Each structure stands twice: as C-alpha cells, then as structure tokens.
Amino acid sequence: MNTVRVTFLLVFVLAVSLGQADKDENRMEMQEKTEQGKSYLDFAENLLLQKLEELEAKLPEEDSEESRNSRQKRCIGEGVPCDENDPRCCSGLVCLKPTLHGIWYKSYYCYKK
C-alpha cells in the first residue's frame, strides 16, 4: 500500500512540476506570438499610412487642375427665354428671336441649332 502511495505521490509531483514548466513555456510562446502580431500590425499600419499619404499628395494636384470657375454653369433649356446679351443656353442650343409663338413675351428663346 505504501508503494502505491509513493508511486502516486511521485507521479503527482512530476505532473505538477512538468505542468508548471508547460504553463511558463505557453506563456512565453503567447508573448512571442503577440509581439510578432504587433510587429505585423505595425508593418501593415505603416504600409497603409504610406498609401494614404500618396493618395493625399495626388489630391491637391487634381483639385488645382479643375478650379471652381471651370465648371459648366447652369444652362437654359430649349424653348426657355434667354437674354440676347448674355445667352446661357445649353450646348447645342442658340439664343434666337422666335418666329411665331412667344413674340409677345420676351424677344429671345433658346432653340436647337
């Protein structure tokens, strides 16, 4: 009976001591993995930051090419009264004097060319 107790006690002590070693080893391994993960995340973050900076550097160049005044202003559609001195008819339309209808309102309307 004593041999069984001694054997059981010996196995128990070995299991506890080896379990502690495995626990410490697992903790160290987890620390290494998290450090590697952090370095990978830092690398990915730096790469993304570089890409965003490149895109941001290109944006002012595109903005300078097209200023606010270079956009097409609102235009007047077909059959709408226009000003003879300042025709704002859309492209493909011309500010002309009407032939029959509209002669009693304004003197010029936008018509197709």
From Swiss-Prot:
Q: Propeptide-annotated positions? A: 22-74
Give GO cellular component annotations, separated by semicolons: extracellular region
Name the organs or tissues of expression: Expressed by the venom gland.
Compartments where found: Secreted
Could you tell me the keywords of this UniProt record?
A: Disulfide bond, Ion channel impairing toxin, Knottin, Secreted, Signal, Toxin
Listed Pfam families = Toxin_22
| Cleaved signal peptide residues | 1-21
Q: Which residues form a coiled coil?
A: none
Give each disulfide bond as a residue pair: C75-C90, C82-C95, C89-C110
Chain spans, region Disordered: 58-82
Tell whether Coiled coil is among the UniProt keywords. Answer: no
MF term (GO), any: sodium channel inhibitor activity
Location, primary (coarse class)? secreted
Instruction: Locate the compositionally biased regions of type Basic and acidic residues.
Output: 58-69
The keyword Glycosyltransferase belongs to this UniProt entry's keyword annotation: no
The entry assigns this protein to a family as follows: Belongs to the neurotoxin 14 (magi-1) family. 01 (HNTX-16) subfamily.
The free-text domain remark for this protein reads: The presence of a 'disulfide through disulfide knot' structurally defines this protein as a knottin.
Described function: Probable ion channel inhibitor.
Protein name in the entry:
U11-theraphotoxin-Hhn1a
